[in-house]
């Protein structure tokens, strides 16, 4: 009898233990961070040698009577006239001409504010609330925007970042594109390029939301932005814990997914900001919440804090002389770009305009001339080309892939019919990943979108 009682008691105790042991946690489900992947494939190209041209390599070097060899999508060699041509290569006489890396525009709205500029195609600002990190510019980009081909043929632009507008404090994700004809935006997406997040400070969010419930002041802008980062930090903590230990999956929030990507260092901040004091505040905020600002865009007062930008490894994305169109753009100077460069910071020329993007070489020429007139040391055409290719590639997180003519990098380059710092020079031929996308002498190599076919001005080169 005693044996039976002991056995029953043991069974009861074991049953109790089983009842209180929690079930194993479910394994965490990984979120697909790239649901709209690039489908880009490079166009076919040929092993090519350009010989006898003046070469700007994008790293500050000028080579007179230079030679550039590229094939299989990449730069093979860059040097002087002594470089031997590989067997079977296509030879191009570059005498009297210039070769440069393809221009990279880090601030464009081609595709989300396309031509023709009708309200039905105006898709750059989701102005329904000041915090919209959940929207993605690529979902507005129209690949048939005629501006893409104009930027290529008139401007030698081979890569560009398409941003949301600046109505919102958090405007949404940007996308980096190869400037190639494609039926879908995914067919243009630069493989491996990180996403960006457009942020804005200053007048634009105040103007848009001042009568819509706010914010209506600069301090309101900052308060809303800080509160949003607090939410993002909490969201990140929940998801980090879940991905480490499993269990019940936290609720998804597309806006917070983007901000978590920033806090994880996977998404780069591109911050619309004009005034020096506001840029300094944004830098302090980035340190408060643990993220890094990749670039300030427009940055007309960058010259006032160039040392601060250099110390924090932040690029300034600037115009040569476009200012005074609103109060926060008033206190600009024409020497802004060369002064930022001279301080050791990352200086970039940008367009923010469908016409300027066709003449970024001329914008750099103006900034260079203004810097030389001011007596800023160390400036040259070869150095200024860094503002058009190398530094933009750095700001987009693709410097290991493009931005300069170095062996192994993607063969994105332009053959100019003269000095590209002259108003009278223009692209003669353009290659992207070693594929010739434009030849001024061959009408068949002037990309025209399907939208333009059969319309007046089809494929015009101005």
In which residue ranges do the predicted regions lie?
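Sec-dependent signal peptide recognition
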Residues: 1-7
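C-terminal motif of bacterial Sec signal peptides marking the signal peptidase cleavage site
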Residues: 15-16
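Histidine-rich, glycine-flanked metal-binding segment
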Residues: 31-35, 40-46, 55, 59-100
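His/Asp/Glu-enriched, well-ordered alpha-helical/loop segment
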Residues: 39, 44, 115-116, 122-135, ...
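Divalent metal-coordination and catalytic microenvironments
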Residues: 53, 68, 73, 96, ...
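C-terminal cap of metal-dependent C-N hydrolases
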Residues: 53-56, 394, 406-450
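Polyanionic/metal-chelating signatures
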Residues: 147-297, 426, 432
């Amino acid at each position: 009898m005693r044996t039976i009682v002991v056995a029953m008691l043991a069974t009861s105790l074991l049953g109790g233990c089983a009842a209180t042991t929690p079930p194993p946690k479910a394994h965490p489900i990984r979120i697909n961070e790239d649901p709209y992947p690039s489908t880009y494939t490079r166009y076919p190209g040929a092993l090519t040698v350009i010989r006898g041209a003046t070469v700007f390599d994008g790293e500050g070097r000028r080579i007179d009577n230079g030679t550039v060899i590229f094939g299989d999508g990449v730069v093979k060699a860059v040097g002087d006239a002594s470089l031997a041509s590989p067997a079977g290569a296509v030879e191009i006489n570059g005498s009297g001409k210039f070769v440069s890396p393809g221009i990279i525009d880090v601030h464009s709205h081609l595709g989300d504010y396309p031509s023709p500029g009708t309200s039905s195609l105006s898709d750059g600002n989701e102005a329904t609330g000041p915090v919209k990190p959940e929207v993605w510019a690529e979902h507005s980009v129209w690949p048939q925007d005629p501006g893409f081909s104009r930027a290529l043929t008139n401007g030698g632009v081979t890569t560009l970042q398409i941003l949301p507008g600046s109505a919102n404090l958090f405007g949404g994700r940007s996308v980096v594109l190869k400037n190639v004809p494609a039926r879908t935006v995914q067919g243009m997406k630069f493989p491996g390029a990180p996403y960006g997040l457009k942020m804005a400070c200053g007048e634009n969010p105040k103007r848009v939301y001042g009568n819509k419930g706010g914010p209506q002041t600069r301090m309101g802008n900052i308060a809303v932005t800080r509160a949003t980062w607090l939410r993002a930090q909490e969201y990140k903590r929940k998801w980090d814990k879940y991905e480490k230990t499993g269990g019940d999956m936290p609720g998804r929030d597309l806006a917070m997914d983007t901000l978590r990507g920033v806090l994880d260092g996977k998404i780069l901040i591109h911050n619309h900001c004009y005034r020096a004091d506001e840029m300094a505040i944004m830098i302090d905020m980035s340190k408060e919440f643990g993220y890094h600002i990749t670039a300030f865009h427009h940055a007309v007062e960058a010259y006032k804090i160039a040392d601060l930008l250099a110390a924090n490894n932040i690029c300034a994305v600037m115009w040569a002389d476009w200012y005074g169109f609103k109060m926060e753009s008033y206190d600009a100077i024409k020497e802004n770009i060369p002064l930022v460069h001279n301080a050791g910071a990352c200086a970039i020329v940008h367009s923010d305009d469908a016409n300027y993007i066709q003449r970024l070489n001329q914008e750099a020429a103006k900034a260079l001339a203004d810097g030389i007139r001011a007596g800023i040391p160390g400036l040259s055409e070869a150095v200024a080309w860094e503002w058009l290719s190398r530094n933009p590639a750095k700001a987009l997180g693709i410097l290991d892939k493009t931005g300069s003519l170095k062996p192994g990098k993607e063969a994105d380059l332009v053959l100019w019919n003269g000095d590209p710092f002259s108003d009278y020079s223009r692209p003669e031929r353009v290659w992207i990943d070693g594929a010739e996308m434009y030849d001024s002498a061959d009408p068949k190599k002037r990309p025209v979108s399907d939208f333009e076919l059969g319309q007046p001005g089809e494929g015009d080169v101005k």
